[in-house]
């Protein structure tokens, strides 16, 4: 296999990972768990959490898995007391009711504080634990598990090199990559080299089934299932994709103790990249190899498009993730590369106005909306209908992707500030 394709696999493995719970509060839990390990004790007097505005925004309304509670305080406190520092985004996989009760006691005793910090980094979290005379601080920046510094009693015991400190820089930087190259890689790479991506289908399908079986969040998936059973909605491709994507997000945002396969640090975007493809493969009766190729196309396509703008911006990343999923739907349906590009153009034209106003249960509605757009856009593409040279959509797909990046980087910082101010009022 050529070096370029090896790079693509490395990128996917770097940012498509299992994650238990919304990744923003989980970043605080992870930092706290690492700090406790360095501290050498769970006898903690105080916990101080400092985060970027964007990480704060995405932690305000989402349940922390295994706790039944919302926010950074419970995430940091239970992470500090019982989190597994070796498990990264699955740091809270083994907590129990006693751990949660002890963490809540720290909060009730006002020993846990959270503050916003003025920083240029979108993903930033610093957790400081105090036990007697000992103080340990762990700082994460540029990625949800990207530790850049550890301090103990004022001494720096770990300091990341400069190239590791700005991980929000594109993971695709310096890599020869485009939508066409992604398509060729996904359709031509040896199956044995890419079949690892099938774990995304396994994990996110289990999460969707959990959302169907139990009541989480707004219960969008369960609501759609009930209406299908009553005959108010058809049991067709569109409805099944809507049901399964929203059910997975319901469970994800509602604190289910099952991991999602995330994409670029987002569980919901991992769901949006996975579940439409899984459902379509079932409907079209594609085989396992075709499913794997479509998932590679969807996940890597989403990573590539999102590499043009910073994470945790005011732009809802489910839009462009669903654009990549729509591209994969065309492949599963036997369409051409040109039609796959049409699908991306159509999705971006349709739903690029969707903003991110924090992680919360209603994110499942946005996942459902963007996935619906993916299906409609694939259907249009198969009929050779494509938006071009309208609004931010350019003549061809690469221009459109660059336009999205420009819109987010230069046009949406004030929108982001306004959203955070409204949420914090």
UniProtKB/Swiss-Prot annotation:
GO molecular function per UniProt: L-cysteine desulfhydrase activity
**One Gene Ontology biological process:** L-cysteine catabolic process to pyruvate
- What InterPro entries does UniProt report for this protein, alphabetically? Ser_deHydtase-like_asu, UPF0597
Q: Can you tell which superkingdom this protein's organism belongs to?
A: Bacteria
Q: Which family is annotated? A: Belongs to the UPF0597 family.
The name this protein goes by in its record: UPF0597 protein VP2173
Q: What is the lineage of its organism?
A: Bacteria, Pseudomonadati, Pseudomonadota, Gammaproteobacteria, Vibrionales
